[in-house]
UniProtKB/Swiss-Prot annotation:
<feature type="compositionally biased region" description="Basic and acidic residues">
    <location>
        <begin position="171"/>
        <end position="180"/>
    </location>
</feature>
<dbReference type="InterPro" id="IPR007864">
    <property type="entry name" value="UreE_C_dom"/>
</dbReference>
<dbReference type="Pfam" id="PF05194">
    <property type="entry name" value="UreE_C"/>
</dbReference>
<feature type="region of interest" description="Disordered">
    <location>
        <begin position="171"/>
        <end position="221"/>
    </location>
</feature>
<comment type="similarity">
    <text>Belongs to the UreE family.</text>
</comment>
<dbReference type="InterPro" id="IPR004029">
    <property type="entry name" value="UreE_N"/>
</dbReference>
<keyword id="KW-0533">Nickel</keyword>
<dbReference type="GO" id="GO:0019627">
    <property type="term" value="P:urea metabolic process"/>
</dbReference>
<protein>
    <recommendedName>
        <fullName>Urease accessory protein UreE</fullName>
    </recommendedName>
</protein>
<feature type="compositionally biased region" description="Basic residues">
    <location>
        <begin position="181"/>
        <end position="193"/>
    </location>
</feature>
<dbReference type="GO" id="GO:0065003">
    <property type="term" value="P:protein-containing complex assembly"/>
</dbReference>
<comment type="function">
    <text>Involved in urease metallocenter assembly. Binds nickel. Probably functions as a nickel donor during metallocenter assembly.</text>
</comment>
<feature type="compositionally biased region" description="Basic and acidic residues">
    <location>
        <begin position="194"/>
        <end position="210"/>
    </location>
</feature>
<dbReference type="GO" id="GO:0051082">
    <property type="term" value="F:unfolded protein binding"/>
</dbReference>
<dbReference type="Pfam" id="PF02814">
    <property type="entry name" value="UreE_N"/>
</dbReference>
<keyword id="KW-0996">Nickel insertion</keyword>
<keyword id="KW-0143">Chaperone</keyword>
Length: 221
């Protein structure tokens, strides 16, 4: 059994003749997202992968076995939804709603691809875009803050989430602090700007400009 613990991401610069001669590891996206895997190559040999956690293999990547031999990765055809629209706006709307659902999406020049899901297929139909079930290789976008395909239960998800939060606070932290300070300053000033004889145990959140003084208001004038 070949033991594989190294990967050269495409484009890797290895001579084309060596790549052509190398056995192929043909896997769907879900299997290519595993750092520990046993698989059978196209020549019948068995291989055991021990790759760094978080590694996602892409079609064209080259694996290096312990004996120095090469294995080329190929993306297997799998059942996916291919989304097309009459214009770019329709495709952008579809991408937006899929992103809100944290769905892995492959972004092409004029199409989107995602793993087949009948619920998402129904949503896309409601968005008035064309979603057709086909068999094709699936190469979704990598995470913006990490190297691959992440879910909430993955070991590296927390790291990616922390990185995303840090970037958010770096760009928005000042504005947030300013708004918070302003809110408390206004509340303090408002609470001391009036003299009332009635009990303050009730929730005092009425707007100043909306408060009308008149008979029965409970204030002494």
């Amino acid at each position: 059994m070949l033991k594989i613990d190294k990967v050269l991401s495409a484009p890797h610069g290895i001579a084309a003749v060596l790549v052509r001669r190398a056995p192929k590891l043909v896997l769907p996206f879900g299997e290519r997202s595993k750092s520990r895997l046993r698989a059978v190559l196209d020549n019948g040999d068995e291989a055991a992968l021990f790759l760094p956690r978080g590694t996602v293999l892409r079609g064209g990547d080259l694996l290096i076995a312990e004996d120095g031999s090469f294995v080329e990765v190929q993306a297997a055809a799998e059942r996916v939804l291919e989304v097309r629209a009459a214009d770019q706006h329709g495709l952008m709307r579809a991408a937006y709603h899929l992103g809100n659902r944290h769905t892995p999406v492959e972004v092409g020049r004029d199409y989107l691809r995602l793993e087949f899901d009948p619920v998402l297929a129904d949503m896309l139909a409601r968005l008035r875009v064309q979603a057709v079930q086909i068999d094709a290789p699936f190469e979704p976008e990598a995470g913006a803050y990490g190297g691959g395909h992440k879910h909430g239960h993955d070991a590296t998800f927390a790291e990616d989430y922390a990185a995303a939060q840090a970037v958010f606070h770096e760009h928005h932290g000042h504005d947030h602090d300013h708004g918070h300070s302003h809110s408390h300053s206004h509340s303090h000033s408002h609470s001391h700007s009036h003299s009332h004889d009635h009990d303050h145990d009730h929730d005092h959140e009425h707007d100043v400009k909306g408060h009308v003084h008149g008979p029965g208001c409970g204030h002494k004038h």
